[in-house]
Amino acid sequence: MTQNSAENPFPVRAVAIRVAGWIDKLGAVWVEGQLAQITMRPDAKTVFMVLRDPAADMSLTVTCSRDLVLSAPVKLAEGVQVVVCGKPSFYTGRGTFSLRLSEIRAVGIGELLARIDRLRRLLDAEGLFDPRLKRPIPYLPNMIGLITGRASAAERDVTTVASARWPAARFAVRNVAVQGPNAVGQIVEALRELDRDPDVDVIVLARGGGSVEDLLPFSDETLCRAIAACRTPVVSAVGHEPDNPLCDLVVDLRAATPTDAAKKVVPDTAAEQRLIDDLRRRSAQALRNWVSREQRAVAQLRSRPVLADPMTMVSVRAEEVHRARSTLRRNLTLMVAAETERIGHLAARLATLGPAATLARGYAIVQTVAQTGPEGGSEPQVLRSVHDAPEGTKLRVRVADGALAAVSEGQTNGL
């Protein structure tokens, strides 16, 4: 093999031939997918189709003979899920890859349901069905986002019923394909667009009934994960009551039909008015009952003697007040007399113990007379010893009825 480098590059034909050789060595493969496009010209023997993987949004070009398409076990059309067997091939002229089919099989209903069940278990294990993740539906949505088929009965049912129940209801309608190969992509795009709109408070995903194949887009993994990622509450109204696509398990609220969805996202004006009227009647009745109870209570209070004649309480207690006053006066008189007598006794004892009584019995109090001199005067002192009154000391002698002046002649012998 020639060494390949920037200085020695391969020509396009060499690369194409090598790639075609590698791919040609591959054996036949079985592939499952959804038919997204079928090109079958009347005069052509080869049919060109596109096989799509909805979960990964990838596609593959396939070719087969016209007879193989006409003899297929199901009518091939866009959106049909099939299993094909083909040999990979690379066309060097256009540099394209495709599968040359040798067999086409339809995916049975049982197989579809089994795959949906496997996906259901996977999403459930990841917590996408957890009731704690369900967002509450607003009581009065400012605007209702509606994703449905163009001019469909589902769109008519939702808008008509919701407007009849709440005339002020507003809608942001996104018409999309609700079956076929383009359904999932368009629904997811519309869902994300409405989720980004700040005016949209709730999103309704509506579609009428159909076969299992028709409802396959609503059990698609991509759509289920897109619903779980929404910040806006999502309501599903897909099919009829028995239908149960996987999106019903992910949404915040499931409605049995589009009409049921309209009833669940907006209140009924008439019912709300009846409720308000009933509340007003009950409030008025409660107020009347309260006023009646209070009036009876006031009447009972007014009928009591104490309120009929307020002086009754004073009259009943007047005699007690008079007795209390008499008792208080008597007790005060006795208390004053007892205290007066006690004070008299104390005064007599004080008089007996005082100096005046002693003087009256013939005793005298002798004091030295205050002396003045150059160094200051001396205070008069009670004479307690003969030594305190030497000769010449001036004395003051106090007796019971007055005082006398005297002069000490000094100490004398004897008493």
UniProtKB/Swiss-Prot annotation:
GO terms for biological process: DNA catabolic process. InterPro entries: Exonuc_VII_L, Exonuc_VII_lsu_C, OB-fold_nuc-bd_dom. Its EC number is 3.1.11.6. Keywords: Cytoplasm, Exonuclease, Hydrolase, Nuclease. It holds the Pfam family Exonuc_VII_L. The keyword Hydrolase applies. GO terms for cellular component: cytoplasm; exodeoxyribonuclease VII complex; peptidoglycan-based cell wall. GO terms for molecular function: exodeoxyribonuclease VII activity; nucleic acid binding. Signal peptide: none annotated. It is found in: Cytoplasm. It catalyses: Exonucleolytic cleavage in either 5'- to 3'- or 3'- to 5'-direction to yield nucleoside 5'-phosphates. Heterooligomer composed of large and small subunits. Bidirectionally degrades single-stranded DNA into large acid-insoluble oligonucleotides, which are then degraded further into small acid-soluble oligonucleotides. Belongs to the XseA family. NCBIfam families: xseA. This is Exodeoxyribonuclease 7 large subunit. The gene is xseA.
